[in-house]
Amino acid sequence: MKMWKKAASVMLASAMVFSLAACGSSGDSGKSGGSSDSDTFKIGGIGPTTGDAAIYGTAVKNGIQLAVDEINAAGGINGKQIEYKFEDDQADSEKSVNAYNTLKDWGMQALIGTTTSTPCTAVVEETHSDNMFQLTPSATAVDSIQYDNAFRMCFSDPNQGSASADYIAENKLATKVAIIYNSSDTYSSGIY
């Protein structure tokens, strides 16, 4: 059930991206790349499909593909069919930036990704420089959407930590709590 909810969330967010992109498709959507055939709209995705975090990237990749298939079957966006390409970044920042450049060279007009926080924080610098629309479905680090071209579908790390603390306090589950976290991990230190 949780996997279906996540896929549904990705599909809804993808539909939002496509709708927003269709509204602004007449302007320049990137300094280099961003142009495509007049009868298509190119959406890129980045996330890990191999490595330790592959379960997250694979779920995002498949969810986006479901949304693309559904939207294209319904006639596309204002008559434009969506072309979709997903790149594996193995949850690595350098590979994620390389994946972004590959998609930009392909002619990507909007990016869904990256899936994990550290690569997303690296890629958002590139999308900001290129004025490329970016939507991350799951990168929760505060810095992963620090510019006005980048958006997040989920809550941020500090929100998760605060919500957990509030829940514990409001439900009187504990009066003292010890926190053990990995200060070298973006997610752990973000929640703390």
Set out the residue ranges of the language-model regions:
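Short, low-complexity disordered leader/linker segments with a strong preference
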Residues: M1-K42, A73
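Flexible, small-residue-rich helix->loop connector segments that border functional cores
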Residues: Q65-I77, I168
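Beta-alpha junction/loop-to-helix N-cap segments that form part of ligand/metal-binding clefts
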Residues: S29-K31, Y56-V60, A74-D143
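Acidic/polar active-site rim loop that often engages polyanionic ligands
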Residues: D143-N149
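Envelope-exposed proteins and targeting segments
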Residues: D39-K42, K80, N149
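An alpha-beta-alpha
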Residues: A150-Y192
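Extracytoplasmic "Venus flytrap"
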Residues: D37, G44-Q65, E87-S93, T115-T116, ...
